[in-house]
Amino acid sequence: MDHTASLSPVRPEAQPTDDRERALRPRLLKDFLGQEKTKRNLRLFIQAARDRNESLDHLFLIGPPGLGKTTLAHITACELGVECKVTGAPALDKPKDLAGILTALSERSVFFVDEIHRLKPAIEEMLYIAMEDYELDWVIGQGPSARTVRIPLPPFTLIGATTRAGMVSSPLISRFGIVERFEFYTPEELAAIVQRSARLLDITLDARAALALARCSRGTPRVANRLLRRIRDFAQVAGSAHISETIVRAGLAHLKIDELGLELHDIQLLRVMIEHFGGGPVGAETLAISLGESPETLEDYYEPYLIQIGLMQRTPRGRMATARAYAHLGLPVPEARTLTPHSPEQGTLL
């Protein structure tokens, strides 16, 4: 599999790099569409913290890329009326990197760490006491003369986001007072997001066009917004000031994105499972090697959506293509391959 997949408009893991795309992010909870349970909880917790004039308890956000974890971290800081310091776990390479940030935080501010599962053990250990006691242990000197100095920190809120909760250590998870899990968005929720983004981008599109685009957005707002901008390009070149359902479908066909939001690399993955491994079960590492991808890319990007829409199952023995996958590819379904739509590993996104 070639790595031009990283340029695909349906790859949700890449962070927005365009100021116009960042401008689509809502700034308040009332403007954040979807994730209703998480919003209800956060609204209550934020109000309680403000009423007590305290920092919000530490918040752990779990979910696939592109669902709004970073956006919600910024919204939380905005709703609290405090600053938000943002970093990624890979940037916290040495203890002094973390110490420099923690000691510069203002009272009740938000410290957002993306990809928190990638923290080094030494950095995690520093965070334990910082999160629990708002203090920082710092070692001065070396060898027998070394001593530990405890530095007081202002009360703050750590917001950690991850796509791989299983890689976060139990001691770190236990220090988060609030844990929220993000779910894929429904087509109706995504259609509302597309219509909001269209208004902000001064794009005219009808409800049917918004829903058609939403159905191909992998349950992910970041993908929906990216596709909206690409479809706008098609409409502009076609000389149309209005985006219709016909233009959406023509644009998606040109981008090689099918009605389920699958691109060529998704189709190739399913075909490799079926044609090379008899539909599975096949291990993640073996499948990743066959595709020329890393196991992490397979698990973080491809699997969640394919499992959610019922094209793949993850079992103790490995990954399996479902009967629905065979049908989607127009292949005969083996008699032994039965579809279990109510399996806990599968969802009902579409």
Curated annotation (Swiss-Prot):
Q: Which GO terms describe its cellular component?
A: cytoplasm; Holliday junction resolvase complex
Where in this protein does the record put region Large ATPase domain (RuvB-L)? 1-185
- UniProt-listed Enzyme Commission number(s): 3.6.4.-
Q: Which GO terms describe its molecular function?
A: ATP binding; ATP hydrolysis activity; four-way junction DNA binding; four-way junction helicase activity
In this chain, ATP is annotated as bound at: L24, R25, G66, K69, T70, T71, E132, D133, Y134, R175, Y185, R222
Entry function: The RuvA-RuvB-RuvC complex processes Holliday junction (HJ) DNA during genetic recombination and DNA repair, while the RuvA-RuvB complex plays an important role in the rescue of blocked DNA replication forks via replication fork reversal (RFR). RuvA specifically binds to HJ cruciform DNA, conferring on it an open structure. The RuvB hexamer acts as an ATP-dependent pump, pulling dsDNA into and through the RuvAB complex. RuvB forms 2 homohexamers on either side of HJ DNA bound by 1 or 2 RuvA tetramers; 4 subunits per hexamer contact DNA at a time.
Oligomeric state and interaction partners are given as: Homohexamer. Forms an RuvA(8)-RuvB(12)-Holliday junction (HJ) complex. HJ DNA is sandwiched between 2 RuvA tetramers; dsDNA enters through RuvA and exits via RuvB. An RuvB hexamer assembles on each DNA strand where it exits the tetramer. Each RuvB hexamer is contacted by two RuvA subunits (via domain III) on 2 adjacent RuvB subunits; this complex drives branch migration. In the full resolvosome a probable DNA-RuvA(4)-RuvB(12)-RuvC(2) complex forms which resolves the HJ.
Q: What is this protein called?
A: Holliday junction branch migration complex subunit RuvB
- Which organism's genome codes for this protein? Treponema pallidum (strain Nichols)
